[in-house]
Every structure is written in C-alpha cells, then in structure tokens.
Amino acid sequence: MIPDFPFPVPIVSAIVERQRQGVTEVLVQVRWKPDRDSVYSGTFEIPAGGIELGESIYEALRREVFEETGLRVTGFRPEVRTATHSQNGDDVFAFVPFCCQQQLSGRTRVGFVFVCTVEAAEPLPAPSEVGQIMWLPTTELARLLAEAPERIFPLQFPVLQFYLSQSTDG
C-alpha cells in the first residue's frame, strides 16, 4: 500500500522516442515493483521518478532514464530553454517542459514531462523497477490506450494521450 503524503512528490517523466524506418516509436516499459506497488506492477509505463535535492530537472530526467533503461539521453523536445538567476545563495531557473502532470489522490505527484531521444543502444531494464522494455509505434501505443487502458500505469495514461494528440503520425 502506498501512503498518502501531505505534499505532492515532484517527479520527471520521459517520453523517449525514436524514428525507425520512417515510423515514430515510443519506449515503454513494464512497471515491476511487486513489493512496493503490487496494484500497478505489470502495467506499462514510461521512465519516471523523483527529483533529488539539488538536482536540475534535466539532470533528474537523464538520471531516471539511465537508471531505468541503461540509455543516455541525447536530446530534448522542445529544445532546452532556460532562464537562470542567482541571488544570496539561491540558484533558480525557469524551463519549458513538453507538458505537466498531476496525480490528485493516492500518492500525489506533480510532474514535468519531456520528450527526449536516447543513444542508439539496446535498453537494459533495471531489475528492481522494470520487467521489460519495448519500442512501440505510436499507432500501436494509441491502440493500447484505446483498447486496454487498465494496462497503462494511471499516472502516465493522460500524458501518453496528450503526447499522441500532439503527434503527426499517432
């Protein structure tokens, strides 16, 4: 059972995409956390996780993608755009994600979603979190969301819907 928290947990999520023979594919993984989340273990998700103290949003995204897939992020969409400011020891910056997400009940989260590309290598699932990793064409991802929404981790369902609504080939 996942406890409720008094404040939302800040997270990052990565929609990892690649072009293969003119088709856009999205990396999806099987969530595998039976000891920590027996309800949703076995559902499809995208790489995501918490932002560590002192870590920039982009550092967190790179770390989470690497931890869960073994792949290194090579680019972002939209391109990285930031504004920074430092004053009295406070370092801050503004950034533009692809979209944002919020979980309102259960383990409440507020997240920042980025579309990114990774190195051309085979993914290696993190055994403590990920059961399997696959690349799905956007058309197949759209069919999965329409025909079997219960197979998608709920936090990522609206994110993937939004992504597909913005896609030119999904």
Language-model features: locations:
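Nudix hydrolase/Nudix homology domain
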Residues: R36, S41-T43, C99, G106-G170
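Aromatic-acidic/polar surface patches that form glycan- and anion
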Residues: F5-F7, G50, G54, R107, ...
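The catalytic Nudix box helix
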Residues: I46-T84
